[in-house]
Amino acid sequence: MGRAKKVVLAYSGGVDTSVCIPYLMHEWGVEEVITLAADLGQGDELGPIQEKALRCGAVESLVIDGKEEFVKEYAFRSIQANALYENRYPLSTALARPLIAKMLVEAAEKYGADAVAHGCTGKGNDQVRFDISIMALNPNLKVLAPAREWKMSREETIAYGERYGVESPVKKSSPYSIDRNILGRSIEAGPLEDPMTEPTEEIYLMTKAIADTPDEPEYVDIGFEKGIPVSLNGVMLDPVTLVERLNEIAGNHGVGRLDMVENRVVGIKSREIYEAPALLVLIDAHRDLESLTQTADVTHYKNTVEEIYSQLIYRGLWYSPLKEALDAFIVKTQERVTGMVRVKFFKGNANVAGRKSDYSIYDAELATYGMEDQFDHKAAEGFIYIWGLPTKVWAQKMRG
């Protein structure tokens, strides 16, 4: 008896997920494999994917357009939370996994499958994100991960696939592992496994080298409503178009590159290169608008929440009770985060050049050092005495 009767497989069109199709059928006794490819803005990579899956033995090949849901329900929530894993990575790849898991579960329920599968290995983060998300959405579904068990080398995997008509798209001149969606690209492996090896310019597609960027700055006004980006330069845009246009603008000025060593869920460190132009700019602009519209205590407490929120996303806990509870807090904090942030793009930098909001709690008459100053300077002395009293008492005791 096979491990499952009917399986919905998360499909990318690459070697591993293509080999998963015959492997599931011939090694694990699966009767039917349905592939599902999520269109999250990979570009033309999804063109021939349906035909390839069918040639590899799938009984049906699904391609689902999830770009709008991805940006609106996943990326924009992350922006409201200023989510940066380890204060740097904007989770452009990690955010896609809970949505793909949701699509897998929905397809399994629609087609009567008793299992879902993915092509993740046992070394990466994505296996954790897929497995836990699927467990949360439908704990009755089996989760199969052939690449986690088959113990084949890259060469052996390709050879196995060729026995069953799987074509290998791998170019020997490209040793990198690359993942792409509308939010950005992640590049790893090959020469990048040496933390001292500088990335070559050829690995970047979304961002220009500084030498190739314009010699004049460009200003962009980003409009927000309740923490959600809604416009560029006063023009209201749908979520997908807004991200696409900002990717182009920021990338044209060399903005959006990251080179970091991060702590994976499975306990190892990994060197990663990321391109995420729009996402990084939006998080920075959003945080700046919050500084204008939120009280100090909300800002300081939210900083703690943001760190935990980022960890939950990275570690595959998008559908967890804690994540749901933090969502409620974050939404509440965004009620007055409405306004505009002006960003200046120039030579690899995206700096906030101005901000405004009808909900601003910045008071120029209190902040100024000019003649218009309304701040009560005399009140400062009493405040300092009370505020510093514990320190003074402690110092007196320590001195005996």
From Swiss-Prot:
Pathway: Amino-acid biosynthesis; L-arginine biosynthesis; L-arginine from L-ornithine and carbamoyl phosphate: step 2/3. It comes from the Bacteria. GO terms for biological process: argininosuccinate metabolic process; L-arginine biosynthetic process; urea cycle. Optimum temperature is 35-40 degrees Celsius. Inactivated above 50 degrees Celsius. L-aspartate binds at T121, N125, D126. Activity decreases to 53.9% and 18.4% in the presence of 1 mM and 5 mM arginine, respectively. Activity also decreases to 80.1%, 78.1% and 92.1% in the presence of 5 mM ornithine, lysine and succinate, respectively. Activity does not decrease in the presence of glutamate, glutamine or asparagine. It catalyses: L-citrulline + L-aspartate + ATP = 2-(N(omega)-L-arginino)succinate + AMP + diphosphate + H(+). A mutant overexpressing this enzyme grows faster than the wild-type strain under photoautotrophic conditions with 5 mM NaNO(3) as a nitrogen source. In contrast, the growth of the mutant is similar under photoautotrophic conditions with 5 mM arginine as a nitrogen source. Belongs to the argininosuccinate synthase family. Type 1 subfamily. Homotetramer. HAMAP family: Arg_succ_synth_type1 (MF_00005). This is Argininosuccinate synthase. It comes from Synechocystis sp. (strain ATCC 27184 / PCC 6803 / Kazusa). The lineage of its organism: Bacteria, Bacillati, Cyanobacteriota, Cyanophyceae, Synechococcales.
